[in-house]
């Protein structure tokens, strides 16, 4: 299995070529000028999900003991908290930095390397943050909406931040590479399993699933960035 960074770079290169190929395309939504290409990539991602990822995630959910699923979720959540501490610090948020940092310390020690989420039980709230959010906090506009092959919804800003997020993930430092990739696959399957229950509901409420997911993603990212002080981050959205 290739290294995660190689996969991400391939996805980004594919996305760039696709967008360059339709650079003159004018979409109906100003936030989604590459909608025609994005829809094709989204359809490809959906086919991969239905053929591979969803069945594997369903088997994982059905046959893996709930306790083991919980420990997997807790372990990778604790790793994500490490990078959140860094980004909350970069956003000059002392409360969020301290509280998330305390979660990491407690869960990594008393919680046995994050397998047990002690932090939540003692009232330490999780404040998730990534580098795309940090860029937005400091005023970088989101840019156009894009769909990345195999990775899904994003924006120009979040795509630019993706490699930084990948390198900032503590799991990216794990060696040997085979063990690292096994963990990446397990985290992906576990994350997909957590959203299995949403599939039917999404199909029921969304007349156009692509538009629904796009609008929900953009709204979520705006809300996450707006946790900080006002900036021109929403300049594109407000036009």
Can you say where each PLM-predicted feature lies in the sequence?
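Beta-rich strand-turn-strand
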Residues: 72-75
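Active-site flanking loop/helix segments enriched in acidic
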Residues: 63-70
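Bacterial N-terminal signal peptides that target proteins for export
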Residues: 1-12
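Bacterial Sec-type N-terminal signal peptides, specifically the leucine/valine-rich hydrophobic h-region
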Residues: 17-19
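Post-signal peptide N-terminal segment of mature Sec-exported envelope proteins
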Residues: 29-59, 77
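A structured, mid-to-C-terminal "fold-capping" secondary-structure block
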Residues: 26, 35, 133, 138-239
């Amino acid at each position: 299995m290739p290294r995660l960074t190689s996969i991400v770079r391939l996805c980004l290169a594919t996305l760039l070529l696709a967008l360059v190929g339709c650079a003159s395309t004018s979409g109906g939504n100003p936030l989604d000028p590459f909608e025609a290409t994005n829809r094709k990539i989204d359809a490809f991602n959906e086919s991969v999900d239905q053929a591979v990822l969803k069945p594997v995630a369903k088997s994982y959910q059905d046959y893996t003991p709930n306790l083991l699923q919980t420990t997997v979720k807790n372990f990778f959540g604790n790793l994500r908290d490490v990078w959140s501490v860094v980004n909350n610090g970069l956003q000059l948020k002392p409360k969020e930095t301290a509280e998330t940092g305390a979660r990491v310390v407690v869960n990594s020690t008393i919680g046995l390397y994050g397998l047990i989420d002690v932090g939540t039980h003692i009232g330490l709230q999780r404040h998730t943050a990534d580098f795309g959010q940090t860029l937005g906090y400091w005023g970088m506009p989101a840019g156009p909406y894009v769909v990345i092959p195999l990775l899904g919804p994003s924006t120009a800003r979040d795509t630019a931040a993706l490699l930084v997020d990948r390198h900032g993930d503590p799991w990216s430092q794990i060696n040997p590479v085979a063990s690292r990739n096994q963990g990446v696959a397990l985290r992906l399957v576990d994350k997909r399993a957590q959203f299995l229950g949403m599939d039917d509901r999404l199909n029921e409420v969304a007349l156009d699933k692509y538009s629904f997911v796009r609008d929900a993603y953009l709204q979520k990212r705006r809300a996450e960035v707006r946790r900080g002080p006002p900036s021109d981050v929403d300049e594109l959205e407000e036009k």
